Amino acid sequence: MNNCINKFIEKYKPGENLQKPDEEILNFGRQMLPKEIIELWEEYGFGEYGDGLLKVVDPREYMNSLYTWLGQKDFNKIPIIVTAFGDIFYYRKLDDNENDVSLLNIHYRKIEVCGYSYQEFFEEYILDEDVIKNVLRADLFKQAIKEFGKLDYKEIFFFTPALVLGGGEDIKYVKKGNGAVHHQVLLQIGQ
């Protein structure tokens, strides 16, 4: 496996109940994503990494949500990882030689580029201690696990009231529930 993915695996140990990809998603991925991401899927699978702080996801499960947030379907933008708080990291193929990984932060309704290549994302960005603390909300995640228990595959932690409505990034505002439903709720709030 590629070195950039190895660093990710070392930092975020794969969970026990990972799901192997089917041929349909592998064929799609081979056309749209770098081979290293496909190798991650094949060797380990979809599910929780880093005790659930991150989930490597089957893109089909988050494409509709991502494209709704972005306002259009664009198969050059593929969801690859979701945080425990439901934010989506997605791969963007910009042209034949250029790509990056961006973050859709559903709580603050913003998008930011996280790495100017998928290698930079896996080798630097996602391993950075400030990112782990502030973007992934690792400390709050640990408190939420203690309070609510581990997340099921389709669950996320979220804030009530929503952060865009004045909630806070504090355990007293955290709840646990279905990620797809909460994505839609937050999207509706902003419309």
Residue map of PLM features:
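A surface-exposed partner-binding patch
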Residues: M1-S102, E155-Q191
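Short alpha-helical interface elements
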Residues: Y62-W69, N105, I126-D128, K146
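Compact, glycine/acidic-enriched structural inserts
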Residues: D100-L136
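Low-complexity, flexible helical/coil segments
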Residues: D74, F89-L94, V113-E123, R137-Q143
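An amphipathic alpha-helical core segment
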Residues: F121-V174
